């Protein structure tokens, strides 16, 4: 997952029809912090920082829309989709519970200026690396806009660990230290100014740590895994590195006050957009990934199409490859369709950047087709002209809120 490709989904269950901030537990972690000054402006990270982990949320029961998997010894195993859906349900329940228990934020005197400086820096980074999305965030309320910037920057920094200039030096222990630092951040002990912006965000909104930890798990997977036996394995990877972004954003962006959508359905739509984006990344970057020795395509589906890793590394576009790619693109589009249903349920200010993101990313699939499925030597991209056309289209569609049919997780 290239850092420059991080595309945020902006679904939210947060506060319906209002701009009041949810505030953390009664002891208000931020008010307990010592006054500190942060001067760390770089995206890259010092990992000499650790803390104590937190316990996972208690399991909840809810109908599951995925199939079970039988392992080689005949035992029934839980599919990746079901595991991810369990996380979705926990996040939805957490939002509902925490919104019922919101309290009044008590900022400590002297911290406002430092936090404004930290958030401004996050906005600058977002503007530099995700210009279209950044413009869309300017329509949001200041509190939501700043929170999304903070989440974006944390995700980008995390992605840089395994995809940036220092990626070859990153070890599992470095990711362990990054996760420990995340836990400190959620406990109100930020290490630098960029951490401070996210630490403040999780005080102001009911953002849970689990999706952040899951993204780090995706980075661990990238260090040790370069093949995926089937779509079940690939689905879990896509959730870790991209679906999590949707779950992080859900408590922040805001739902239309007239929406009848359930919390779970909005989370599902957010998850679907993350999965769709990552599948699109994978299909676009086949050639780039093979040069790194990686194949992010289901091995069993390659075999069914009469293809092998050798064919991928040879990089020749054949009829077998075209047919294989048609099925992969069809799957990605199905996830985009599910995601689009949920965007209609966002409040108007939050719909535009998310819808623009979806329209632009979905066009990458069109470009792969236009390149005759040659994603070995050609990198599909959306031209500036098409991007400029998509932005007003997204804005116009964001003004309309059709009624939503509750989406379910889709796994072709």
From Swiss-Prot:
It is found in: Plastid, Chloroplast. Keywords: Carotenoid biosynthesis, Chloroplast, Isoprene biosynthesis, Plastid, Transferase, Transit peptide. One of its GO terms (cellular component) is plastoglobule. InterPro entries: Isoprenoid_synthase_dom_sf, Squ/phyt_synthse, Squalene/phytoene_synthase_CS, Trans_IPPS_bact-type, Trans_IPPS_HH. One of its GO terms (molecular function) is squalene synthase [NAD(P)H] activity. Monomer. This is Phytoene synthase, chloroplastic. It comes from Oncidium hybrid cultivar (Orchid). The lineage of its organism: Eukaryota, Viridiplantae, Streptophyta, Embryophyta, Tracheophyta. The gene is PSY.
